[in-house]
Design a protein with these regions (language model features):
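Proteins with a high burden of low-complexity, intrinsically disordered sequence enriched in S/T/G/P/A and R
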Residues: 23-24, 67-68, 102
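Basic, Lys/Arg-enriched alpha-helical interface segments
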Residues: 1-62
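Enriched for short, Lys/Arg-rich terminal
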Residues: 70-74, 78-102
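Basic/aromatic recognition patch in beta-strand/loop cores that engages polyanionic ligands
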Residues: 52-81
Length: 102
């Protein structure tokens, strides 16, 4: 089984920081749980990232964007097969309109 290197873009890192900061306003323990769960699921993309579907937007799908849902957040990523890299591009609240943000 091929293993991929999972990397986070600066945008995705900031997105995750923003999620944690927002949730910390309500509960530090909830913020920590969300952070841990998002990281575990994102890092699981090192194995079989193709298990996640392509996004619904045609233009982004053509660019290779896929999504992974973690509770009420969505992790957007692309796979570089030639380099065996999963590039996490963004993490955002699932109800947001993602097409203009990616």
């Amino acid at each position: 089984m091929q293993e991929y290197n999972v990397v986070f873009s600066e945008t995705a890192e900031k997105d995750l920081d923003d999620v944690v900061e927002y949730l910390s306003n309500f509960s530090a323990s909830i913020a920590r749980r969300y952070y841990d769960e998002i990281m575990v699921k994102a890092l699981s993309l090192a194995f079989m990232p193709q298990r996640c579907p392509f996004v619904q937007d045609t233009a982004l799908r053509e660019k290779g964007y896929r999504w992974l849902f973690v509770r009420n957040y969505t992790v957007f990523f692309v796979i570089d097969e030639a380099s065996s890299i999963v590039d996490i591009r963004a993490i955002m609240y699932s109800s947001r309109e993602y097409t203009a943000l990616l």
